[in-house]
């Protein structure tokens, strides 16, 4: 079935679309209506189920999959006709972002997509078209009109743009749909989310939906807070789906909605918008292979983060790092999924015997395995493998290297 938002998206929301000719690499970009893509259909079904079941929604996605256009669709739909037949008057929709450029119509933000959609519907459809307020500068729109006697008529539906940063007071009391653009840029996202939940929930009931979206490899995003919402959605009343995205044995059992690089990749789908996943994956992996042998060691990380296959790849923070970030992230996900892997690690302390020998004894101290930590956290010594000794019971000379980090946690690493 086609949801109301998807129907509106396909029929009333012109956008800039890429067109390709078979056998040519040249493409043109022009205004048209969006194509029917299975990934966008999945998104609409996910959002519909979230609303119907009284949950909120969250999405992590690749670039170029119409996230901002879909947010603009929700805004224009709710402004002109309301959320539904039951709630078609005084419906409020708020678009919020940590930075104003994600909103403003002159910065190619979401409002830059919303305003043309609104103009098209007003000019070309018989839907209500009288605006009581139309102020891009104030990021405020309201349907309605003034009657001759001065009274206000019409639906009085509203759309507001709010640059919230981490100030939860800007969203406090806003009782309507709340759309978070580039959620990863909110440093205090969890606190902001918890506060705004009170504005859209009443006990166990949810009367408006919050929808959070984030883009893979956004340079301004850290995703520190967003990861908790993505990997533990049910703890925050967010619609979850089975985690079919991560590799088996890594990640959590459930996740939010993820739009990976192999879904609806350009040139890798048929006329019905159904993806050729194998073809897309081969292209993605070939691009990584080529980047691996480039001059810049971080190039492969950027390629991975731009076209993520798994959620962990989408939130890689690409900096001037020369560590195998993707492999480390995969290992971290495996440990999160299987904490029993820590069972073979020795935890304890070192002491000096009466003969001057250094020995190890186990303790019940708790090692530091999550960051950041409080300054007064004690931590513990962990040994992954006991030192190898020769036939005389002595540790081999020159076999181990000790590295010391004098700052931060005062970390000492013994490496074989």
Residue ranges and their predicted role:
Residues 72, 108, 112, 116, ...:
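RNase H-like, metal-dependent nuclease domains and their acidic two-metal-ion catalytic environment used
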Residues 196-207, 213:
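Substrate-engagement module of ASCE P-loop NTPases
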Residues 100-103, 166, 216-220, 263-266:
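Conserved nucleotide-binding/hydrolysis micro-motifs of P-loop NTPases
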Residues 1-56:
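Pre-P-loop entry segment of helicase/translocase ATPase cores
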Residues 61-64, 98, 215-218:
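Conserved H-loop
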Residues 89-165, 239:
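Conserved nucleotide-state-sensing and coupling region of NTP-binding domains
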Residues 52-75:
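Walker A/P-loop
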Residues 78-90:
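Post-Walker A helix-loop "phosphate-sensing" segment adjacent to the P-loop in P-loop NTPases
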